[in-house]
Amino acid sequence: MAEGDEDSYTDSLMSNENGRPGETNLQEELQMFRARWMSELTPGLSSGGLENRPCNAAARGPVGKVSETKAKQELAKEAKARELFLKAAEEEQNGALYEAIKFYRQAMQLVPDIEFKINYTWSPDGDTKNFLDDANNDSKMADLLSYFQQQLTFQQSKLCQPDIDVTQTHISVLPMEVLMYIFRWVVSSDLDLRALEQLSLVCKGFYICARDPEIWRLACLKVWGRNCVKIVPYTTWRQMFLERPRVRFDGVYISKTTYIRQGEQSLDGFYRAWHQVEYYRYLRFFPDGHVMMLTTPEDPQTIVPRLRTKNARTDAMLLGHYRLSQDTDNQTKVFAVITNKKEEKPSDYQKYRYFRRPQVQETERSFHVGLQLCSSGRHKFNKLVWIHHSCHITYKSTGETAVTAFDIDKMYTPMFFVRVKSFTAVSERPL
């Protein structure tokens, strides 16, 4: 260091003698900087170059240390979130839902997708391990709805998120009220709850919307009216709609009757024809209390498309109202009163213009039908058994009513339900 200072001093003297004062100062500063730099590097060079590698590592050390520190912090955060999540699962199993929600929230705040990173074979203690063993044995959750609701609460996200990037506005930006109104349109006035169940398969948010109690309550009121004011003995309105006996609206009840009758005897007397007669009965119910009934030899492929609306153009069509009745023996019955479609008769003034018009007694004819609602096989409420059928003729002039009751024999075959997809393909009004 002393030799360097002497050299710098000698150079400065020479520069003062031969050069300008400004250049002399610059040279002095450069020499002093070089001297200090060499003095700092001298200890490293004295060890034979072996310490050059640690110096290079120290030069790039801060970046590596920062990345290593971040990795350790992430691992520690994930371990903490894992412990909180498993503790929340244990609290939920014990019935402490509020404590479980608190731990779930803390775990989600640390690592949002901690649920998918947990190895359920690992547990911090023995109690949690026992709980996870029980959970693995029972893979299906008892209450999927509450589980989805908790997940959406922890994540504090929207009901749904787009699966792929789209430029158009996604349905997830709609508020809850608008989404619920759309769901009511899906159910529609035809009570297409099957479409609602299919819609719930889209995502967790749609599943929660499809289980909204208000939708199922409105559906129950549409079916049973004032008879379903109380939800007891069912736990939810959805359970009532699915398990309580009711008629179905998304199809037709059909029965087929076949019998043999004699024909006319041939001229020679040696042969008598026999005819096999087939005819169908169709019964279509509507949520507003209307019912249609048709008896015809035409097959279902021809008749069923005409039964989509109540304005079917068929002469033999009977229209009326129905109601459900549940007796003390828990047998659900359907009673209906149906009449012929009212059509305007052409004026017969010209026909009897020059003659005395005959006195025709005006009458009203209606049919009273009683059916018992049953289930067959794996399908619910898909069978109607005849219990009553009568014809009521009322004479308008006297007000008297003549009742003719028909015997319920083997000609009254049970009616079975057939679902028709086209009946619920279009929604006309919301629920």
Curated annotation (Swiss-Prot):
Compartments in which it is found: Cytoplasm
CDD domains (UniProt xref): F-box_FBXO9
Keywords of this entry: Cytoplasm, TPR repeat, Ubl conjugation pathway
UniProt protein name: F-box only protein 9
Annotated region (Disordered), positions in chain: 1-24
Keyword Phosphoprotein recorded: no
GO biological process, one term: SCF-dependent proteasomal ubiquitin-dependent protein catabolic process
